[in-house]
UniProtKB/Swiss-Prot annotation:
GO terms under cellular component: DNA-directed RNA polymerase complex; mitochondrial matrix; nucleus; replication fork
Catalytic activity: ssDNA + n NTP = ssDNA/pppN(pN)n-1 hybrid + (n-1) diphosphate; DNA(n) + a 2'-deoxyribonucleoside 5'-triphosphate = DNA(n+1) + diphosphate
Chain's role: DNA primase and DNA polymerase required to tolerate replication-stalling lesions by bypassing them. Required to facilitate mitochondrial and nuclear replication fork progression by initiating de novo DNA synthesis using dNTPs and acting as an error-prone DNA polymerase able to bypass certain DNA lesions. Shows a high capacity to tolerate DNA damage lesions such as 8oxoG and abasic sites in DNA.
Assembly and oligomerization: Interacts with RPA1; leading to recruitment to chromatin and stimulate DNA primase activity. Interacts with SSBP1. Interacts with POLDIP2; leading to enhance DNA polymerase activity.
Coiled-coil residue windows: 1-22
Lineage of the species this protein comes from: Eukaryota, Metazoa, Chordata, Craniata, Vertebrata
Name used for this protein in its record: DNA-directed primase/polymerase protein
This protein's record includes keyword Transferase: yes
Sequence positions that bind Mn(2+): 114, 116
Region span, Disordered: 210-230, 480-503
Organism: Bos taurus
């Protein structure tokens, strides 16, 4: 009896020691003593589009993250939560450590890079030196094309290298500067790496280089023929002057190409011995999944950590830990609007064509000068109605979308009436800001005096027909109608059993699969629903769930 008791006591002591080393995670509950903590929102979705629709209907600032489910099948479920709540659980729950930020389509974002090469295929490559040279080259390009000053101290350098592969993520922390979206980031990166493309082409005449990510396959146009233009955000000149500015940038680009920098250090070999770039150019696609700080790929054991040669150190805050600050800095789409923020663009010719959707008369509008519709064309039309009155025909020069705040910022041209001074500015343009979460719009302007006063007009309600819930409802009705039509025309489409297997590649998930087919798979969302229900139940309980106890005991 005594031996049995001693064995039981020893087992209890071992468990107590285990829990001291690995304590059970508590439940996230915002506290009144910390008003900065957002309410609890933790919702899982089987489809990415459902997750984004929920974000748009949510009044809180929430974000979409992708969680890998199983090794090898490429399937992911999508989590919607706040940065604060994700970090609360992320610190202690292993099942969250295969997590990706979903960089929203059209959203303002940071400049970022994904770097990798096979060490065995490149025995002489010095990864750290290559990273330093790349950062130096990018900083020079930012200064030359956008007059943006930065250095290695403004670059968060994350490492997930193994004995076989060198792997880094670079996220630039530019001061009051961001890119219009990650497509513009990709255009900029491809442009500044042109000398490396040409070098590969000259070394192998049988290969036409292209920058599709992991391999070189096709790059049909020279830099001058491609006509990509660089322009910084001009907020106090009208369209004609903006065109001149762009021409000057192109001239500088041409002169820079005549004395191309040596980018031979960027050329590496894959495991087949084929030449490719050190920079992965496949990470600049819409709704891109980009691995989070401290996450590893599922089935792998090396997470993204701060690199030994990292020179970026976040500003210390008494309310936020250093690790949390690194986490927030690593988020590519974590950019907030401010009057001082400059938005950088890098367009290709296709996006410089005049776009009919902005025209209220059915003809192209010169004032728009080719900027495409925002994600909400109905709101574009509403904004145009605000600046087309009293005989003045204003236009939208450009728009920028801030995903965290669901804020659309429209730069207006040919309409300068300012509520602050009660008349039109003589030379400075205005902005119309549409707050989609709060369903209001207001005016700010680029005039230095108004900026110094931090002027913001009164808020005015959006018409009901352009509010997000109304637009989402219309979108759902359209999708339903389209699905019904597709089912009529294609009765032999793929079955839900086939679609529910989840054997999709990363590329499939990144590029998106036709919603009309995936709608059938919603019946097979038990995985997401079960996970969601368990998490919701977990958040409601004060006691520790049995499932969590079992999981901890088995580790």
């Amino acid at each position: 009896m005594k031996r049995k008791w001693e064995a039981t006591l020893k087992q209890i002591e071992e468990r107590a020691s285990h829990y001291e080393r690995k304590p059970l995670s508590s439940v996230y509950r915002p506290r009144l003593s910390k008003p900065e903590e957002p309410p609890s929102i933790w919702k899982l979705f089987h489809r990415q589009t459902q997750a984004f629709n929920f974000v748009k209907s949510c009044k809180q600032e929430v974000h979409v993250f992708a969680l890998e489910c199983k090794v090898g099948d490429g399937q992911r479920i999508y989590l919607v939560t706040t940065y604060t709540q994700l970090w609360f659980y992320y610190k202690s729950r292993r099942n969250l450590l295969h997590c990706y930020e979903v960089i929203p389509e059209n959203a303002v974002c940071k400049l970022y890079f994904d770097l990798e090469f096979n060490k065995l295929a490149n025995p002489g490559a010095d990864g750290k030196k290559m990273v330093a040279l790349l950062i130096e080259h990018v900083c020079k390009a930012l200064q030359e094309f956008y007059t943006v000053n930065c250095s290695a101290e403004d670059v968060l350098n994350l490492d997930s290298s193994t004995e076989e592969k060198f792997s880094r993520h670079l996220i630039f922390q530019l001061h009051d500067v961001a890119f219009k979206d990650n497509i513009h980031v990709g255009n900029f990166v491809r442009k500044i790496l042109q000398p490396a493309f040409h070098l590969i082409a000259s070394e192998d005449e049988d290969m036409t280089p292209e920058t599709t990510g992991h391999e070189f396959t096709h790059f049909s146009e020279t830099p001058s023929e491609q006509g990509t233009c660089f322009s910084k955000m001009s907020t106090d000149i009208d369209v004609g002057e903006s065109q001149t500015s762009n021409s000057e940038k192109l001239g500088r680009l041409g002169s820079a190409q005549q004395s191309s920098p040596d980018l031979s250090f960027l050329i590496v070999k894959n495991d087949m011995g084929e030449k490719r770039l050190f920079v992965d150019l496949g990470v600049y696609t819409r709704n891109r999944n980009f691995r989070l700080y401290k996450s590893s790929k599922i089935g792998k054991y090396v997470a993204l950590e701060v690199a030994e040669d990292n020179k970026f150190f976040p500003i210390q805050s008494k309310n936020i830990s250093k690790e949390n600050q690194y986490f927030l800095s690593s988020l590519v789409s974590n950019v907030r609007f401010s009057d001082a923020l400059r938005i950088l663009t890098c367009d290709v010719p296709q996006s410089k064509q005049r776009v009919q959707c902005f025209s209220r008369t059915g003809t192209s509008v010169e004032a728009i000068e080719g900027f495409q519709c925002s994600p909400y064309p109905e709101i574009d039309q509403f904004v145009l109605s605000l600046v087309n009155k009293n005989g003045i025909k204003g236009g939208i020069r450009r728009w920028n979308y801030f995903f965290p705040e669901e804020l659309l910022v429209y730069d207006i041209c040919k309409y300068r009436w300012c509520e602050n001074i009660g008349r039109a500015h003589r030379s400075n343009n205005i902005m119309i800001l549409v707050d989609l979460k709060n369903e209001v719009w207001y005016q700010k302007c680029h005039d230095p005096v108004c900026k110094a006063e931090n002027f913001k007009s009164d808020c005015f309600p959006l018409p009901a027909e352009v509010c997000l819930l109304s637009l989402l409802k219309e979108g759902e009705e359209f999708t339903t109608d389209t699905t019904a039509d597709t089912e009529t025309k294609s009765p032999h489409g793929p079955s839900s059993s086939v679609l529910s297997k989840g054997a999709f590649s990363d590329a499939d998930w990144d590029n998106g699969i036709d919603d009309t087919y995936i709608l059938e798979a919603t019946e097979d969302a038990e995985l997401a629903e079960a996970a969601e229900n368990s998490l919701l139940a977990y958040n409601r309980m004060d006691e520790i769930p049995d499932e969590l106890l079992i999981e901890v005991l088995q580790e």
